[in-house]
Amino acid sequence: MTIGIVSYGAYVPRYRIKIEEIARLWGDDAEALKNGLMVYEKSVPDVDEDAATIAVEAARYAMARSGVDPSRIGAVYTGSESHPYAVKPTSTIVAQAIGATPEMTAADFEFACKAGTAAVQACMGLVGSGMIDLGLAIGADVSQGAPSDALEYTAAAGGVACLIGRKESELAAIIEDTYSFTTDTPDFWRREGMPYPEHGGRFTGEPGYFKHVTNGAKGLLEKLGTKPEDYDYAVFHQPNGKFPSKAAKILGFTKAQITPGLVVPKIGNTYSGSCLMGIAATLDQAKPGDRIFATAFGSGAGSDAFSITVTDRIEEIRNRAPKVSELIKDPVYIDYARYARHKGKIRLA
């Protein structure tokens, strides 16, 4: 059975803070940070934006592109590590907002930055089994980094929704196959009640990101019998600009393959939306017949790899909602004081 992406929608808040502004406050070397991270600014949510509102915006854009009746959606799954409620699903909020309730199922997913792709896989399973007609998978975050922590330079806000289906006439992209690689690796964590996550810093790269991304990618390539040169585009999880570039080089993908989907330099790491944002940016410009190789990563740790082929229908739906490039342009820059207010970093005892 053929399963794939019927539609997709992305959302990025319009506010930005430059690396120089954060570095100025903490006395850090902005140029060294920009060169090391390959990130120059990051998105910031408005004071009334959270993972739920971002998920709703992305879902609405996905529905606008699709043109399908929302009552056909049998499942809404939202992946995030910044759900606004500890007990109250984000996914029910989204489902109600797009008119998909009540004859459907919903749940929230968590797996650090790959919760969104985990939701995609769950929807693929339900759609493929025939249990549901369409499934909506979302990755959305308003990620947090403690003041002066290295994460503060990249932790951003944004989200992507993917409508998963099986009717070939409706598919804008076919998901040929998927492969996951998972271990128990404590590279990044946040306990209940902690306002900010903790991490192993520079020592998390090899045992966390690179081990899982390369093994997940190699696993799918071997499963399909394909090679990097068989793909027109490649997308890897983007905690910064340096890691996906290095992963691509290790695996044999070229800079030309990853550049179209590499959005982290302009918006930062959108966590659960990161890999999906790269896929969305790539779908915004891919041609029918193009192949996309994508690998998401989530700390804790695991990776989800996907092989995707774009269909003729992409030309029909692409311009029905804003492209990622359109969401990124014309940002409103703010200083650290306003950033702290937007991010809720100013707390009264």
UniProtKB/Swiss-Prot annotation:
Keyword Transferase tagged: yes
Catalysed reactions, as listed in the record: acetoacetyl-CoA + acetyl-CoA + H2O = (3S)-3-hydroxy-3-methylglutaryl-CoA + CoA + H(+)
UniProt-listed InterPro entries: ACP_syn_III_C (IPR013747), HMG_CoA_Synthase (IPR004656), Thiolase-like (IPR016039)
Annotated TM spans: none
List of residues binding CoA: R202, K242
Quaternary organization: Interacts with acetoacetyl-CoA thiolase that catalyzes the precedent step in the pathway and with a DUF35 protein. The acetoacetyl-CoA thiolase/HMG-CoA synthase complex channels the intermediate via a fused CoA-binding site, which allows for efficient coupling of the endergonic thiolase reaction with the exergonic HMGCS reaction.
Protein name stated in the entry: Hydroxymethylglutaryl-CoA synthase
GO MF annotation terms: acetyl-CoA C-acetyltransferase activity; hydroxymethylglutaryl-CoA synthase activity
Keyword Transferase: yes
Entry-linked Pfam families: ACP_syn_III_C
Sequence similarity: Belongs to the thiolase-like superfamily. Archaeal HMG-CoA synthase family.
Enzyme class at the top of the EC tree: transferase
Pathway: Metabolic intermediate biosynthesis; (R)-mevalonate biosynthesis; (R)-mevalonate from acetyl-CoA: step 2/3
A GO BP annotation: farnesyl diphosphate biosynthetic process, mevalonate pathway
